[in-house]
Amino acid sequence: MSKVLQCCQLSKSYIQGDIETKVLNDLELSVDKGELLAVVGSSGCGKSTFLHLAGALDSPSSGKVLINNIDIHQLSDKERAKFRNEHIGFIYQFHHLMMEFNAQENVAMPLMIRGEKPKDALLAAKEMLDQVGLSHRIDYRPSQLSGGERQRVAIARALVTKPSLVLADEPTGNLDSDTAEQIYQLIRSLNKTAQTSFVIVTHDLVLANRMDRQVKLVQGQLRPLSDNSEQALPPTSSITDPANNIKDNEPQANERHV
């Protein structure tokens, strides 16, 4: 089976003054086409750093990241931005939708950034919103949508470019259990339909154990998650929101622009 993502001896260190902190240490990973991979780990273990490197948002101290056999960190900044747009989708715990645009316009944005005609981009966005069950909400702005609906818009935006790899950071972490289940079923359905690979960072081991494979980030390296009886890990403070457990039928009207 073809490999969508390969991390080879991937290391990342941060230096502050005379202190060097090694976050990732010769990390190795291989993700197959169409695979659903869960990454878990304790707070501050480097999961966000890993996602940034895998998504070409940051550069490693050493090692390689290959997506579809392309060494993404050998590309120029312009080439890397183009590659991200064409091959990688991103889903976050907080949707990061543009509040001044409606759902269809938000989903169409990556295609318009790519240079596609607005008419074609909006049509593709409409079709994608239909796939995630939101064709009746295309004219709604984020402030008019519930938490679950906004996350579905974010998923549609991540997939509208037909990426081979989607990187998701706590995609259900800010949702109640019923809405989280809907999002999981949506991800599983889209994964099956398009054979898109997903790498999902989560603290929820119940969700993680429903993926095809689970790994745990420990001491800068990824290891198989062998103990499926573990309880959910505590959330990372930097991504924890006080308005947790947003219900799917509760619109959030007072969101800030992002």
UniProtKB/Swiss-Prot annotation:
Annotated InterPro entries = AAA+_ATPase, ABC_transporter-like_ATP-bd, ABC_transporter-like_CS, ABC_transpr_LolD-like, LolD_lipo_ATP-bd, MacB-like_ATP-bd, P-loop_NTPase
Q: Which residues form the signal peptide?
A: none
Biological processes annotated in GO: lipoprotein localization to outer membrane; protein localization to outer membrane
Tell me the CDD domains matching this sequence. Answer: ABC_MJ0796_LolCDE_FtsE
Q: Which GO terms describe its molecular function?
A: ATP binding; ATP hydrolysis activity; transmembrane transporter activity
Q: Can you say where in the cell this protein is located?
A: Cell inner membrane
SUPFAM superfamilies per the UniProt record, alphabetical: P-loop containing nucleoside triphosphate hydrolases (SSF52540)
For this UniProt record, the keywords arranged alphabetically read as follows: ATP-binding, Cell inner membrane, Cell membrane, Membrane, Nucleotide-binding, Translocase, Transport
Ranges of compositional bias, category Basic and acidic residues: 247-258
Q: Polar residues bias located where?
A: 226-243
Instruction: Give Gene Ontology CC terms.
Output: plasma membrane
Q: Name one Pfam family in it.
A: ABC_tran
- List every stretch annotated Disordered: 222-258
- The residues that hold ATP are G41, S42, S43, G44, C45, G46, K47, S48
Annotated membrane topology: Peripheral membrane protein
Which top EC class applies here? translocase
SMART domains for this protein: AAA (SM00382)
Carries keyword Flavoprotein?
no
Q: Does the keyword Membrane apply?
A: yes
Which EC number(s) does the record attach to this protein?
7.6.2.-
Subunit composition? The complex is composed of two ATP-binding proteins (LolD) and two transmembrane proteins (LolC and LolE).
State what this protein does. Answer: Part of the ABC transporter complex LolCDE involved in the translocation of mature outer membrane-directed lipoproteins, from the inner membrane to the periplasmic chaperone, LolA. Responsible for the formation of the LolA-lipoprotein complex in an ATP-dependent manner.
- In its UniProt entry, what is this protein called? Lipoprotein-releasing system ATP-binding protein LolD
Which organism's genome codes for this protein?
Colwellia psychrerythraea (strain 34H / ATCC BAA-681)
Give the source lineage, highest ranks first.
Bacteria, Pseudomonadati, Pseudomonadota, Gammaproteobacteria, Alteromonadales
Instruction: State the encoding gene.
Output: lolD
